[in-house]
Structure formats: C-alpha cells, structure tokens
Regions:
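Adenylate-forming
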Residues: 164, 178-195
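Conserved AMP-binding/adenylation subdomain of ANL enzymes
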Residues: 118-132, 140-180
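Short hydrophobic alpha-helical segments of the AMP-binding
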Residues: 52-57, 114, 147-152
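Conserved AMP-binding/adenylate-forming core of the ANL superfamily
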Residues: 1-33, 72-75, 85, 109-112
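Conserved AMP-binding/adenylate-forming
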Residues: 18-69, 135-139
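Conserved S/T- and glycine-rich ATP-binding loop of Class I adenylate-forming
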Residues: 39, 56, 97-100, 133, ...
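Conserved AMP-binding A3 loop
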Residues: 92-119
C-alpha cells in the first residue's frame, strides 16, 4: 500500500522526471503558443500515471495517459497523428476513448472544461473533503481520471489498488471506511459477488 498526503503528492509532482519514462511528441501549433509538446504517459502504475499527468500539466506539457494494453505500434501511430495534425489551441490535456471501434482515439480537453464542472459534479455525487472513494482502473480512462481529480479537487481521499482480487478491494474499502465506489459495472458485479 502507498499513501500520499497532499504535500507528498505535490513533492512527487515537482520531482517527477517525466522525460525518462514517457514519450514526448512535438508538433507545430496553428498559432504561437508555449504548449507544443504532448507527453504520452506509458506507465502501469496508477499512482505514477497520476503524478506524471499532474507534473506534465505543471511543466507546460499536454499530457495523455496511454491505456495499459496499448501496443508500441499503436503508440507510434498515435504519436505520428499528433505530430502531423497537432492539437486544438484550447487543449490542456488529452484523453483516450475506450476503443470500442477498434482503436482508442484521442480527445482533447481544457482544464476549464473539467474544473468549472467539478463543484456541480461533486454536489450531485455528495463528494467533499470527507469523501473516501475506492476506484479501480487505469488513469487513462476519462471517467477514472475525472473522478480522481474531482475528489482531489474537493480535498477528499482516493483509495485504489493494482490488485485484481475483489477480496483485496473489500479489505481496502473496510480499512479506509470508503463511502463512495467508482467502477465499471463488470467490476461492481465482481465486488458484489464477493461481499
């Protein structure tokens, strides 16, 4: 188990060496802008994905977390598309679709498009500084990344694990007195079966 306070997470963001573990894709922006590099984050660790994503934003890159199962060939194709097509001027980060049509596709978002909605979203789902949410999955999926950042935005606690064992999930849920769960329906069914 790894635990981070907000201060430790901030220190990890500042000290993250994103250039050694992720792929930088340069592109020529349509207009003059400081943001001309997309960082394709390739890491299996949820915590490292989060730290690198936040560090990339902090350092002026446009981060995009690659799905864990993406092969090198597709990442190369994605890098070529980004390099040749660029990204919208308003883009602060990229997310990938789930790939239901065969291959994940990039979607470009602005920080504002999320941050302006967090308070509304958190109110709807009763998320605040006392929230303890369990979630399972990769930070590369937009629902997971949105929920993590929304909970951190409110000052809440995020609990996750790389374990695929529902019994481990239940242990963590009980240990940390989790009051919210965010998971795909298939994972929720697994969880219910083991309760």
């Amino acid at each position: 188990d790894e635990q981070y306070t907000y201060g430790q997470l901030y220190d990890a963001i500042l000290s993250s060496d994103i250039n050694t573990i992720s792929r930088t894709v340069k592109f020529t922006p349509a207009k003059e802008t400081a943001k001309n590099k997309v960082l394709l984050i390739q890491n299996q660790s949820f915590v490292e994905q989060l730290v690198q994503w936040l560090s990339s934003l902090y350092k002026g890159y446009i981060p995009m977390v690659c799905h864990n199962e993406m092969d090198t060939g597709y990442i190369d194709e994605l890098a070529c598309v980004i390099s040749s097509e660029g990204v919208p001027l308003s883009a602060d980060f990229g997310v990938l679709t789930s790939g239901t049509t065969g291959r994940p596709k990039p979607l470009w978002r602005s920080e504002k498009s999320w941050s302006e909605f967090f308070d509304i979203q958190n109110n709807i789902f009763h998320i605040n500084k006392d929230t303890k949410i369990f979630l399972h999955g990769s930070f590369s999926f937009t629902g997971v990344s949105n929920m993590v950042i929304a909970v951190l935005w409110s000052g809440g606690t995020v609990v996750t694990t790389s374990s695929m064992r529902p019994n481990r999930w239940i242990q963590l849920i009980e240990k940390y007195h989790v009051d919210h769960i965010y998971a795909l329906p298939t994972k929720l069914r697994l969880l219910v079966r083991h309760c």
